[in-house]
C-alpha cells in the first residue's frame, strides 16, 4: 500500500472552508444538478498548464461530492478520442450545426495545477422585479419615473428561486416597456439575449407560475451589487397612478404574445464568433435591436393606434436624421464611442435610452480604420505576458475585421451579476436611497432623470453643461450619503457589469485596453483631474450641488471643445502633455524639500497640496471637458466606486464579515482626490520607457514592508535608515475581520499585488525617493518581479526582489533550505515558484532542495507552540540551552541572531516580532504588531489537516530527505574502550551536518557529539611499524540534562586514514566557538588582524553565524518539510483560484454564448419539468415526513407498552425493592426485634458512609499520585472518572449494592468493581453479625450502626493497597487487549473500504448501519428510562427534576461513551499511543468534563425554563410516555448519516497520512468532534427537555385543579347526604306505618296490594350505605384500580405488603412464591445458613475490630 500514496489525490472538502469558489449562487447549487447532465460531452473551456513539464498530463479537478458542475477526472494518456468528440455548436433553424472555426483558450494560459474546469451558465436567481402597467391606462405622452430600489428579502422564497425567473405568458391586459434598463430580468448569469423581428423562427412559450402576491409596491429588478452606480441603481416605470394594479409579471412576461402584432423571438449569439462568421446576420442583428428595443411600446393601445407602424414610419426618416447629426457631432461621437471603452479599465456603466437612437449609428468605416491603425502602432505597450502573445494577435485581427464589417455598432442589453449574499447589506442602505418614494430631494431626482435621458454627447452646448452638472450632482448624492452613514460596505468591483452600447464595444476591445497613444492619455489625465475637481467642489453641500463658478467655467469654454479636424485635438493633447510634465517637475522639487518633516505635517501638507493641484488644474482642464464627456462619466463612476473604498476603508472591515463572495477578495486602491492624476502621469512615463534596456538595480532603496493594519486609511511602515513608506492605496484584509472571506477563498492575485504595490509606490515617490531615485528604478523592479511570478525562472526572484541588507536571499546559504520562518517579512523564492516546476532536474534539485542546515529556530518555534511536537517526540539535543542563572563550565558568546533563536517564546513576544510560523496560536498572533499579508491572512485560514499534497510534492520531500542522508560521510575506525588495558573495538564515524555520530553499527549509536562542543582534536601517536596507522583523541564537553552540569570527556581513536582526522579537524575549526578562557587570546588576535582585508573579516563573521545550526534527525526533517510544502500548496491554491477567477471574468461572455447556444434548444422542456419535479419532490417529502412521524409514534407506543408489560417493570421492582424484601423475610424468619424503622436506618447509614468513604479514597489516591508524577496520567484519571460515575448513577449503585453484588463495568471503570468487592463484603459481614447476635441485642440504635460502620471502614483500609495494585494491573492489561482488537478490526475494515471503494455500496452500508444504530438506540433509551425511575414513596409529591436529570445523564453518557469513546477515540489515539499516552488520557478527560458540564447546565436551565413558562407548552394533551417518545425521537436525530460518513472519511484520510501527520491530526480531529458534539447537543436536547418539563408542570397543575374541584363537590355531596339521611329516617317511620296498614288490607285485596306494594317499594327504596359511599370513593387511593386503568403509572405505586412479592426471573407476571424459592441462587437451606453464620462468628472473633 506504500506505493498507492503517490498515485491518488483526494480533496477532502470539509471543515472551515464553507463554500468553494465555483459556488457563486447559493440558491442554484442543488437545483440544476439534473438539468446539466446533458452537458457532459459538450465542448468545455479548458485551462491548461504547461503540458511539456508534466509527463503524466493528468487533470486534477476539485470535486464537490454532490455536484456535477465540476467533476473529478483523471484522464488517460490517449485523449484523442475525446478530442474528436469536442465541437462547437450553433443554433440554426432550431438544430445543431457545428462551427468550423473552433476557438479555444490558449492552452498555456497560466501556471496552474487545474487543467480542465467546466464552466456552465447557471439560471439566475434574480432578486428583483419589474413593475408593468396595463395597456388600457397607457397614454401617448408619458414620463419616466425613477424609484429607488429596495430588497425584497421577505418574498425570497418565491423571488429568488430559480424556477420563477422565466415563466409563463402574461395576461392580455399586462404589458411591459421592453427597455434596455429592464430587459435583463430575463437573462441568465453572464449571458446576452437579443430580439429579432417577425421573420425569425418559431415562437417561445413559457410555463405559468403564479408564485407571488399581488399589489406589491416598489418592485425592484436591480442587483444588490449595483448600489453605488449612479445610473444603474434606478429603474423606470410608467404611470405611477397604477401602482396598486401591479402583478409580478416579470416571471410571466413573454417575448411573444398571441394577440400582439409585433412578435419577438429570443436568441443568443456569440459576440465574437457571430461577427466573424456571418456579417450579414450581424447587420440584421443591429437593425432588429434598434427597431425592437427603441420602440416605446410594442403593443397596440386602446385608442387603436398601431405603435409598431408608427415606429416604422420613423425608420423612413432615419437616414436624414443621421446625416444631420453626423455633420454636427462627428468629433464628439468619435471620442465617446471608441476612446471611452479603451480607457475604461473598470466595469463602469453607461446607460443608453431609446430617446437618442440616431446617435448610435454615426460611425463610418474610415474613422474606425484610423483608430485601429493607431492601435496597431502602439500595441508594443501591451503588458508582456508570455502566454497571451498569440491570443492577443489573433484577437486584434479578429476585432478589426468584425468592427469594420459591421455598419452599425452593437446595442446590447445589460447583464447584471447576481450576488445573493448582499441582501442584508442592501437592506441596510435601503432607507437612505428612497428617492422615488419619499421625494426628499426633488432636484436630485430631476437631475437623475435628465442624466438617464441624455447619455450621448450629440447634444447642444447648453445641454452639455447640464450633463456635467447632472453627473456632478449624482456623484454628490452618493458622497453625501456615504458621509451620513458609516456602515457602507465596499463596492463589488465586478458586480456592476452592464452590457450596453459602449460595453459591447469595450468587451470586444478589452484585450487592447492598454493600447493607447500618449495623446489619448493626456486627455484621460484631464478627465481624472476634472473628476477629482468635481468631487472637491460638490462634497460639502447636499442640495446646492453646483455653483455658479462651475457653470461659467463650463459655458465659457464650450466653444473651444469641438474642433473640425482630428489634428487639432491631437495638437492640443500634445500641448497638454508638455504642460503636465513641467507641472510635475515643480511638484517633485517642492515635495522633496518637505520629506524630512514629521508624519502629521506631511499629512496636512498632503491635503493642502491636493486642493492646490485640483484648483490649478481646474481652468486648464476645462478645454477638454466636452471632448471627453463620455470619459468623464465613466471615470466619475469609477471614482465613485473608489471613494466608497476610501471612506469605508477603516470601517469596511467589519462589514466585510457578512460578505463571503469571492469577488470581494481583492486589494482595492485607496485613492485620494489627486491620486488619479498622479497615477496617469506615472503610467505615461512607464509606457514611454518600456523599451529602454537600462534597468537600474534600485532594489536597495526599496523593501516590501511588513504592513500593519490600523483603523486609519494610511499605513505607515518602518523601513531601514531614514526611509519611510506611506501607502494610500493598499488595503490589508485582517484575518479576524475577514474570517468569512478567508475561509472561502484565501488567495490574492500575485501580479495584481505587485502592480498595486508599485503603483502606490509611484504615487508617493515624490515624498519618498531621493534626488537620484527615478521612476525607471521602480518600474524595472516591478517588471522583474512580475516576470518571475509569471515565468518559469526561479533565480531572478532571489536577486531582484529585495536588497542586500534587508533581503531574504542574502541571509541564506547555498546549502540551506529556504524555509518560511528564516526571514519573517518576505516570501521565499522557492515558495513562489514551487508549483511551476514539479519535477526539476537532479542538478537543480541539488542546488535548490538538497540542504540540511535547518535552523533550530524553526524546530524550537514548533515546540514552543505546544501543538505539533511534544517532549516524547523531540530528540534530545546535546547543545540544549541551560537556564539563565546557571553558570556553565563553558559559555558561548552568542550574537544577536542566536540569542533570538534560543530565547524563549515569551521573549520573542516582548520584542514584538511576530514570526511567520504558521503554527502560532491565534491569541499570540493578535498581540503582535506586524502581520504578513500572505501567511497571516490566507494560509492560517485554511485547515491544514484537510490538505493533501499531490504525488510530485511527496517525491520532492522524499528526494530532499534522502539527500540529507547522502551528504553524511561515514568512516571506519577503532575506538578505545578499556580503562587499564587498551581495548579497541571497530566503529563507524559519521560526519553529519552539525554532529559527529559514533556508531557500533548501523543500528546501534554509541554517542552523538556536536561540533560546537568539541574542544580539541589532536594526533596522539603514530605507529612506527605501520606508518598509515595513527592514534588521535577528541576532547569534548559532556552536558547532563537533569543535573545541568558539564565535564570534559576524552575519546581515543585508531585509524588508518588521515582523511578522518582532517575531516573532523576541519569541521571543528569551522564551528569552534570561543570560550571565556580564549577571550584574552581573541583580544590579542584582533590587534594582529587589523591589517587584514574586509573580505577575510566577512568570511569569519559568516563562519561564526553557522555555530547556531544544529543537527536535526530525519523524522523531524520530514515533519517540517511536509508542513512547509503544505503551506506552499495553500499559497498556490490561492493564486490558482485568483487566476481562474480572472480568466473566468475575462472570457465569461464568450463561453456563456457558447453554452447558451446549446442550452437554448431544450430549456423550454426543462422549465416544464422543473415545476413538476419540484412540486413532486415537495409532495413526496411532506408525505414521507408525515408517514415516518406517524409510524415512529406508533412504533414507540408499541415498544413502550410491550416492554412495560414484559420485562422493564419487573426488572425495576426487582432492583429497587430487593433490600426491602430481604429484610422483611429475614425479619419474619428469625424474630421481631428488628423493626422496619431500624432497618431503614441501617440502609441509609450504610449507603451514606459507603459513598463518603469511597470519595475519600479517590481523593487521597489522586492527591498522592499528583504529588509523585506532577501530572494526571491515565491511572489518576480513571479514579476521577469513577468518582463522577458514582455521583451520577446513585440509584443504579443502590440497586446493585443490595441485589446482586456482581458488577460488569468496562475497562476504565474496573476500579468500581474492585472497591465494591472489598467494601461491600464488609457490609455484608456486618449485617450478618447483627442478624446472628439477635439474642443478645434487644434494640438497634443509630450509635451501634455508626460504630459498626467505623469498624468496617477500618477493615477496608487494610485492604486498600492490594486493591489499587490489582486495579493498576487490570486497567493496563484490559486496555491493551481491547485497543488492539478494536484497532485491528477497524484498520482491516478501513483497508477493505479503501480498496473496494464503491460509492453505491458505501451508501447502502451507511444506510444499514444508520438504521441499525437508531433501532438499537431507541430500545436502549426506553430500557434506561424505566430502569432509572426508582421507588416512588408518594404519588402526589414527585420530584420530576431529579428523575429527568438522571435519565438525561445516564442516556447521554452511555451513548457517547460506547459509540464515540470506545470506537472512534480508541482507534484514532491507539495509532498515536506509542508516543502520546499522556495526550490520550488528556483528550478523553476533556470530553468527559465537557459532557458533565452539559448535563449539569443544560438540564437545569431547561427545567427552570419550564417552571417559568408552562403556558407555552405545545404538547398539553399528550401523556408522559408520548412526550418522552418525542424527546427520544429528537435526541436520536443527533446521530445522523453525516457523522458516520465523516467518520469513514477520516479513517480513509488517516490511512494515507499516518506516517506524516501522526499526533497533530488525531488530536485536532478529537477537538473538532467535541466541538460538533457540543453544538449538536445544544440544538437538539434543549427542545426535548423543554417538552418534558412543560408537560409535567401542566399535568401537575391540571391534576391540582381537578382535585380542588373534586373536594368542593365532595363537600357539597356530604351536605346533601346528611340531609338525605334525615329524610330517609322519616321515610322509614312512615314505611313502618304503611306496613301495618298493608297487613290489615292484605287479607281483603291481596293481589292489588301486592302489585302496589312492589311498585312503591321499588321506587321508594334507597341504595344501601355501602353502595352510596363506594360510588363517590376516591379511586386514586386504590393502586390496583389505577394500574388497571393506567398501566403506565405502576412505578408510582407505594411500597406496601401487597407489592412485596418478587416476580420470577423468567416470567414477566407477579408470583406469590416464597422468597427462598425465588432467590434459590442466593439463599440456601436454613441449616447451611446457620453453618455460615457460625463460621462467620468464629472468623470475626479472631479479627481485631
From Swiss-Prot:
Keyword annotations: Coiled coil, Merozoite
Coiled-coil ranges per the record?
Answer: 1080-1110
Q: Where is the composition biased (Polar residues)?
A: 524-574
> Which intervals carry biased composition (Basic residues)?
582-612
Q: Which GO terms describe its cellular component?
A: cytoplasm; membrane
Ranges of Low complexity composition bias in the record: 615-629
Q: How is it used?
A: Possible candidate for an effective malaria vaccine as determined by epitope response in sera.
Lineage, top-rank taxon, reads Eukaryota
- Region (Disordered): which ranges? 522-635
Q: What is this protein called?
A: Uncharacterized protein PF3D7_0207100
Q: Which organism is it from?
A: Plasmodium falciparum (isolate 3D7)
Amino acid at each position: 500500500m506504500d506505493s498507492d500514496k503517490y498515485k491518488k489525490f483526494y480533496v477532502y472538502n470539509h471543515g472551515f472552508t464553507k463554500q468553494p469558489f465555483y459556488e457563486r449562487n447559493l440558491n442554484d447549487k442543488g437545483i440544476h444538478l439534473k438539468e446539466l447532465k446533458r452537458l457532459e460531452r459538450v465542448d468545455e473551456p479548458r485551462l491548461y498548464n504547461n503540458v511539456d513539464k508534466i509527463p503524466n498530463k493528468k487533470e486534477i479537478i476539485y470535486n464537490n461530492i454532490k455536484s456535477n458542475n465540476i467533476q473529478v477526472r483523471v484522464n488517460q494518456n490517449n485523449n484523442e478520442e475525446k478530442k474528436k468528440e469536442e465541437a462547437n455548436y450553433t443554433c440554426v433553424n432550431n438544430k445543431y450545426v457545428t462551427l468550423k472555426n473552433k476557438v479555444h483558450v490558449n492552452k498555456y494560459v497560466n501556471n496552474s495545477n487545474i487543467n480542465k474546469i467546466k464552466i456552465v451558465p447557471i439560471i439566475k436567481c434574480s432578486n428583483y422585479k419589474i413593475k408593468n402597467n396595463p395597456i388600457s391606462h397607457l397614454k401617448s405622452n408619458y414620463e419616466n419615473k425613477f424609484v429607488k430600489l429596495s430588497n425584497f428579502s421577505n418574498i425570497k422564497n418565491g423571488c429568488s428561486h430559480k424556477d420563477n425567473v422565466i415563466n409563463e405568458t402574461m395576461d392580455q391586459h399586462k404589458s411591459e416597456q421592453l427597455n434596455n434598463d429592464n430587459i435583463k430580468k430575463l437573462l441568465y448569469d453572464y449571458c446576452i439575449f437579443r430580439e429579432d423581428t417577425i421573420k425569425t423562427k418559431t415562437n417561445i412559450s413559457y410555463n405559468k407560475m403564479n408564485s407571488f402576491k399581488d399589489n406589491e409596491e416598489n418592485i425592484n429588478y436591480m442587483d444588490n451589487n449595483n448600489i453605488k452606480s449612479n445610473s444603474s441603481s434606478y429603474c423606470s416605470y410608467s404611470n405611477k397612478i397604477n401602482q396598486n394594479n401591479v402583478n409580478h409579471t416579470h416571471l410571466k412576461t413573454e417575448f411573444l404574445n398571441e394577440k400582439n402584432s409585433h412578435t419577438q423571438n429570443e436568441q443568443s449569439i456569440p459576440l465574437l464568433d457571430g461577427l466573424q462568421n456571418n456579417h450579414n446576420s450581424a447587420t440584421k442583428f443591429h437593425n432588429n435591436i434598434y427597431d425592437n428595443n427603441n420602440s416605446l411600446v410594442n403593443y397596440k393601445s386602446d385608442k387603436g393606434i398601431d405603435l409598431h407602424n408608427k415606429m416604422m414610419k420613423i425608420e423612413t426618416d432615419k437616414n436624414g436624421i443621421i446625416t444631420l447629426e453626423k455633420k454636427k457631432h462627428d468629433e464628439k461621437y468619435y471620442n465617446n464611442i471608441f476612446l471611452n471603452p479603451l480607457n475604461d479599465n473598470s466595469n463602469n456603466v453607461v446607460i443608453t435610452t431609446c430617446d437618442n437612437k440616431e446617435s448610435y449609428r454615426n460611425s463610418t468605416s474610415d474613422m474606425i480604420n484610423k483608430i485601429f491603425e493607431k492601435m496597431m502602432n502602439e500595441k508594443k505597450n501591451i503588458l508582456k505576458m508570455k502566454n497571451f502573445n498569440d491570443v492577443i494577435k489573433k484577437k486584434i485581427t479578429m476585432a478589426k475585421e468584425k468592427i469594420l464589417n459591421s455598419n452599425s455598432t452593437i446595442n446590447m442589453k445589460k447583464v447584471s451579476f447576481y450576488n445573493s449574499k448582499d441582501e442584508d447589506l442592501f437592506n441596510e442602505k435601503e432607507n437612505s436611497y428612497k428617492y422615488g418614494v419619499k421625494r426628499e430631494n426633488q432636484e436630485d431626482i430631476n437631475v437623475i432623470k435628465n442624466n438617464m435621458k441624455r447619455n450621448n454627447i450629440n447634444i447642444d452646448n447648453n445641454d452639455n453643461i447640464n450633463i456635467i452638472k447632472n453627473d456632478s450632482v449624482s456623484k454628490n448624492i452618493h458622497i453625501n450619503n456615504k458621509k451620513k452613514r458609516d456602515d457602507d460596505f465596499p463596492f463589488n468591483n465586478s458586480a456592476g457589469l452592464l452590457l450596453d452600447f459602449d460595453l459591447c464595444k469595450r468587451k470586444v476591445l478589452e484585450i487592447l485596453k492598454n493600447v493607447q497613444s500618449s495623446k489619448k492619455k493626456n486627455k484621460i489625465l484631464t478627465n481624472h483631474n476634472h473628476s477629482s475637481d468635481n468631487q472637491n467642489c460638490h462634497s460639502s453641500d447636499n442640495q446646492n450641488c453646483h455653483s455658479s463658478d462651475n457653470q461659467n467655467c463650463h459655458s465659457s469654454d464650450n466653444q473651444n471643445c469641438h474642433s473640425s479636424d482630428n489634428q487639432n485635438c491631437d495638437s492640443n493633447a500634445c500641448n497638454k502633455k508638455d504642460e503636465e510634465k513641467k507641472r510635475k517637475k515643480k511638484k517633485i522639487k517642492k515635495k522633496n524639500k518637505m520629506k524630512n518633516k514629521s508624519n502629521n505635517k506631511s499629512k496636512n501638507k498632503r491635503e493642502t497640496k491636493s486642493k492646490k493641484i485640483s484648483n490649478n488644474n481646474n481652468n486648464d482642464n476645462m478645454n477638454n471637458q466636452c471632448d471627453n464627456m463620455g470619459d468623464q462619466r465613466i471615470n466619475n463612476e469609477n471614482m465613485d466606486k473608489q471613494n466608497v473604498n476610501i471612506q469605508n476603508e477603516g470601517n469596511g472591515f467589519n462589514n466585510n464579515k457578512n460578505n463571503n463572495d469571492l469577488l470581494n477578495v481583492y486589494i482595492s486602491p485607496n485613492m485620494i482626490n489627486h491620486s488619479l492624476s498622479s497615477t496617469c502621469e506615472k503610467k505615461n512615463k512607464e509606457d514611454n520607457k518600456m523599451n529602454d534596456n537600462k534597468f537600474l538595480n534600485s532594489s536597495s532603496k526599496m523593501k516590501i514592508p511588513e504592513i500593519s493594519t490600523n483603523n486609519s486609511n494610511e499605513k505607515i511602515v518602518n523601513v531601514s535608515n531614514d526611509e519611510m513608506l506611506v501607502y494610500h492605496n493598499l488595503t490589508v484584509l485582517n484575518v479576524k475581520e475577514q474570517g468569512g472571506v478567508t475561509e472561502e477563498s484565501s488567495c490574492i492575485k500575485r501580479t495584481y499585488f505587485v502592480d498595486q504595490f508599485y503603483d502606490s509606490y509611484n504615487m508617493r515617490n515624490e515624498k519618498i525617493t531621493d534626488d537620484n531615485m527615478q521612476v525607471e528604478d521602480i518600474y524595472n523592479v516591478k517588471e522583474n518581479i512580475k516576470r518571475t511570478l509569471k515565468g518559469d525562472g526561479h533565480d531572478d526572484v532571489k536577486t531582484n526582489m529585495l536588497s542586500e541588507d534587508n533581503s531574504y536571499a542574502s541571509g541564506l546559504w547555498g546549502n540551506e533550505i529556504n524555509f518560511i520562518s528564516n526571514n519573517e517579512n518576505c516570501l521565499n523564492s522557492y515558495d513562489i515558484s514551487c508549483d511551476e516546476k514539479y519535477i526539476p532536474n537532479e542538478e537543480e534539485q541539488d542546488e535548490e532542495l538538497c540542504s540540511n542546515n535547518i535552523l533550530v529556530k524553526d524546530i524550537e518555534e514548533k515546540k514552543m507552540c505546544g501543538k505539533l511536537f511534544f517532549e516524547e517526540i523531540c530528540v534530545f539535543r546535546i547543545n540544549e540551552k541551560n537556564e539563565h542563572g546557571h553558570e556553565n563550565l563553558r559559555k558561548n558568546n552568542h550574537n544577536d541572531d542566536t540569542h533570538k533563536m534560543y530565547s524563549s517564546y515569551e521573549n520573542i513576544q516582548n520584542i514584538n516580532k511576530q514570526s511567520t510560523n504558521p503554527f502560532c496560536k491565534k491569541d499570540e498572533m493578535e498581540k503582535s504588531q506586524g502581520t504578513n499579508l500572505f501567511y497571516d491572512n490566507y494560509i492560517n485560514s485554511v485547515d491544514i489537516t484537510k490538505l493533501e499534497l499531490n504525488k510530485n510534492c511527496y517525491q520532492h520531500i522524499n528526494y530532499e530527505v534522502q539527500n540529507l542522508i547522502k551528504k553524511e560521510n561515514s568512516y571506519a575506525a577503532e575506538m578505545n574502550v578499556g580503562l587499564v588495558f587498551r581495548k579497541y573495538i571497530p566503529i563507524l564515524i559519521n560526519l553529519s551536518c552539525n554532529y559527529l555520530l559514533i556508531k557500533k553499527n548501523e543500528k546501534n549509536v554509541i554517542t552523538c557529539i556536536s561540533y560546537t562542543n568539541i574542544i580539541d582534536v589532536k594526533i596522539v601517536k603514530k605507529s612506527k611499524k605501520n606508518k598509515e596507522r595513527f592514534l588521535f583523541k577528541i576532547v569534548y564537553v559532556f552536558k547532563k540534562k537533569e543535573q545541568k552540569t558539564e565535564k570534559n570527556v576524552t575519546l581515543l581513536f585508531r585509524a588508518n586514514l588521515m582523511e578522518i582526522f582532517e575531516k573532523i579537524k576541519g569541521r571543528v575549526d569551522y564551528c569552534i566557538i570561543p570560550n571565556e578562557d580564549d577571550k584574552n587570546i581573541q583580544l590579542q588576535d584582533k590587534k594582529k588582524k587589523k591589517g587584514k582585508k574586509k573580505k577575510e573579516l566577512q568570511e569569519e563573521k559568516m563562519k561564526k553565524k553557522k555555530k547556531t545550526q544544529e543537527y536535526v534527525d530525519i523524522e523531524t526533517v520530514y515533519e517540517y518539510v511536509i508542513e512547509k510544502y503544505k503551506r506552499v500548496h495553500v499559497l498556490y491554491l490561492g493564486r490558482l483560484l485568483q487566476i481562474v477567477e480572472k480568466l473566468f471574468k475575462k472570457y465569461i461572455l464568450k463561453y456563456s454564448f457558447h453554452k447558451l447556444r446549446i442550452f437554448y434548444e431544450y430549456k423550454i422542456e426543462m422549465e416544464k419539468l422543473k415545476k413538476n419535479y419540484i412540486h413532486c419532490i415537495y409532495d413526496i417529502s411532506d408525505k414521507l415526513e408525515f408517514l415516518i412521524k406517524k409510524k415512529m409514534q406508533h412504533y414507540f407506543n408499541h415498544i413502550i407498552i410491550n416492554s412495560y408489560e414484559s420485562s422493564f417493570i419487573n426488572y425495576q421492582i426487582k432492583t429497587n425493592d430487593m433490600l426491602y424484601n430481604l429484610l422483611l423475610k429475614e425479619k419474619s424468619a428469625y424474630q421481631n426485634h428488628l423493626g422496619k424503622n431500624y432497618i431503614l436506618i441501617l440502609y441509609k447509614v450504610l449507603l451514606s458512609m459507603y459513598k463518603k468513604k469511597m470519595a475519600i479514597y479517590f481523593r487521597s489516591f489522586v492527591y498522592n499520585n499528583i504529588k509523585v508524577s506532577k501530572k494526571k496520567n491515565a491511572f489518576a484519571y480513571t479514579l476521577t472518572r469513577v468518582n463522577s460515575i458514582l455521583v451520577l448513577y446513585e440509584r443504579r449503585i443502590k440497586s446493585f449494592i443490595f441485589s446482586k453484588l456482581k458488577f460488569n463495568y468496562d475497562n476504565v471503570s474496573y476500579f468500581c468493581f474492585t472497591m465494591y468487592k472489598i467494601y461491600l463484603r464488609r457490609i455484608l459481614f456486618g449485617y450478618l453479625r447483627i442478624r446472628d447476635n439477635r439474642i443478645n441485642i434487644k434494640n438497634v440504635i443509630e450509635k451501634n450502626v455508626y460504630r459498626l460502620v467505623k469498624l468496617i471502614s477500618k477493615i477496608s483500609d487494610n485492604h486498600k493497597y492490594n486493591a489499587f495494585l490489582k486495579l493498576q494491573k487490570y486497567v493496563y492489561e484490559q486496555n491493551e487487549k481491547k485497543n488492539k482488537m478494536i484497532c485491528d478490526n477497524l484498520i482491516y475494515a478501513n483497508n477493505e473500504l479503501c480498496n473496494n471503494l464503491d460509492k453505491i455500496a458505501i451508501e447502502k452500508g451507511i444506510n444499514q448501519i444508520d438504521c441499525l444504530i437508531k433501532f438499537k438506540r431507541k430500545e436502549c433509551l426506553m430500557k434506561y428510562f424505566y430502569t432509572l425511575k426508582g421507588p416512588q414513596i408518594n404519588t402526589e409529591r414527585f420530584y420530576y427534576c431529579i428523575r429527568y436529570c438522571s435519565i438525561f445523564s445516564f442516556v447521554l453518557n452511555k451513548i457517547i461513551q460506547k459509540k464515540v469513546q470506545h470506537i472512534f477515540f480508541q482507534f484514532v489515539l491507539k495509532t498515536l499511543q506509542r508516543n502520546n499516552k499522556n495526550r490520550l488520557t488528556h483528550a478523553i478527560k476533556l470530553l468527559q468534563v465537557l459532557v458533565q458540564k452539559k448535563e449539569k447546565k443544560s438540564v437545569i436551565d431547561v427545567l427552570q425554563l419550564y417552571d417559568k413558562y408552562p403556558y407555552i407548552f405545545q404538547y398539553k394533551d399528550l401523556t408522559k410516555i408520548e412526550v418522552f417518545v418525542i424527546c427520544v425521537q429528537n435526541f436520536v436525530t443527533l446521530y445522523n448519516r453525516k457523522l458516520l460518513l465523516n467518520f469513514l472519511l477520516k479513517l480513509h484520510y488517516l490511512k494515507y497520512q499516518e506516517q506524516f501527520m501522526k499526533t497533530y491530526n488525531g488530536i485536532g480531529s478529537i477537538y473538532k468532534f467535541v466541538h460538533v458534539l457540543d453544538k449538536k447537543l445544544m440544538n437538539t436536547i434543549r427542545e426535548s427537555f423543554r417538552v418534558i418539563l412543560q408537560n409535567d408542570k401542566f399535568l401537575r397543575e391540571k391534576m391540582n385543579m381537578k382535585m380542588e374541584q373534586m373536594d368542593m363537590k365532595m363537600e357539597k355531596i356530604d351536605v346533601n347526604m346528611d340531609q338525605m339521611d334525615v329524610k330517609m329516617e322519616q321515610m322509614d317511620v312512615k314505611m313502618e306505618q304503611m306496613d301495618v296498614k298493608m297487613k290489615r288490607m292484605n287479607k281483603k285485596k291481596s293481589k292489588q296490594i301486592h302489585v302496589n306494594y312492589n311498585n312503591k317499594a321499588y321506587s321508594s327504596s334507597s341504595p344501601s350505605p355501602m353502595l352510596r359511599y363506594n360510588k363517590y370513593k376516591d379511586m386514586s387511593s386504590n393502586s390496583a384500580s389505577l394500574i388497571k386503568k393506567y398501566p403506565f403509572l405502576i412505578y408510582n405505586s407505594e411500597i406496601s405488603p401487597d407489592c412485596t412479592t418478587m416476580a420470577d426471573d423468567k416470567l414477566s407476571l407477579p408470583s406469590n412464591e416464597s422468597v427462598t424459592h425465588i432467590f434459590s441462587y442466593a439463599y440456601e437451606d436454613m441449616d447451611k445458613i446457620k453453618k455460615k453464620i457460625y463460621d462467620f462468628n468464629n472468623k470475626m472473633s479472631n479479627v481485631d475490630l
